[in-house]
Amino acid sequence: MEAWAGAGGLLVNPYREIDMETRIFSKRDIEEAARVLKAGGLVAFPTETVYGLGGNGLSRDAARKIYAAKGRPSDNPLILHVSKIEEVNPLVESIPEKAKLLMESFWPGPLTLILKKSEIVPRESTGGLDTVALRCPDNALSLALIEKAGFPIAGPSANLSGSPSPTEASHVYHDLAGRIEGILDDGAVGIGVESTILDMSGDVPTLLRPGAITLEDLTEVLGEKPEVDPTLVGKKMEDGFIPKAPGMKYRHYAPKAEMILFCAVEEKGSEDKISKRIAEYLEEEGLKFLEEQIAILCAEETKHFYQEMAEKEGIILKVLGRRNEPLSMTHNLFRILRECDEEGIGLILSEGYSEEGIGFALMNRMKKAAGQKIILV
């Protein structure tokens, strides 16, 4: 069991090899956290989506440290966080009118825009690309940290590469204690999945990662529906694929357990179909998992389908949230996947949900967590 003491102290994890002490900052320590960043160190920071792993976005060395701390492939771009729209100007060649309109409509907020970078942005921060990913987070502490630091803060999710994203400071500590200088603790985040990413560097706005700013939201502001990158709708990546945004190329958000997603071809009657298929799967394949603890991820509205079976077979039920409140599911998803890791779950069977609105982001993360292991019903 790893120690966690919250804001205000130096913590050491005795169960991993440690190169440095990781200080836990509270909001009273914002000046000190900024000093660490100015000195070239790394500080995890809260946003409204997930916790980010912060470093100087204009420093080659800081970018390299971020990749090393996470174990992140160096061709996976970082997002630079700014505290206001005006800070974007020196970082890009130009700001297209439509991009400016999106900034004015959704910033601060969970929208990342990709634009052509200027010379001052090092390629170490962009995965070697001539574009840069930018956003202004909707979190008072992160905005204050950016202002105090005086430069854009590069910030991928503050977790080990490939594992579920951190939605609480304790999640960051679990993954990165001893690898970074500090964690700015602001409790649990609100949204729970990473920002929407829209590529505005070409002629046509293109969605690269779904998030809380939905396609419908973007369409309303732009007056046209953005294109959707083919990899988001099932197209396989070709050899040599170069990701323009985080979350595109590599397996992400994955628990240690095998995870299987059960999705309905048609929405009508999907709750009943999915629950019956999960029960059938356990009858057909259950003998393969006699030595494994099994968990079922379900909605509040459908947990009654599984309760008798769970009690009889010793299966753990994890309730993601309510089907008619998908934001409750995004808020809980990564926390629950981490709980499954902590509880030694070997197999996760999960319901699938509607991909309308923010459901597109929810299902994108769930499919990646399952490694695209999907059973259609």
Regions found by a protein language model. Name each.
Residues 14-377:
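Active-site-adjacent structural elements in enzyme catalytic cores
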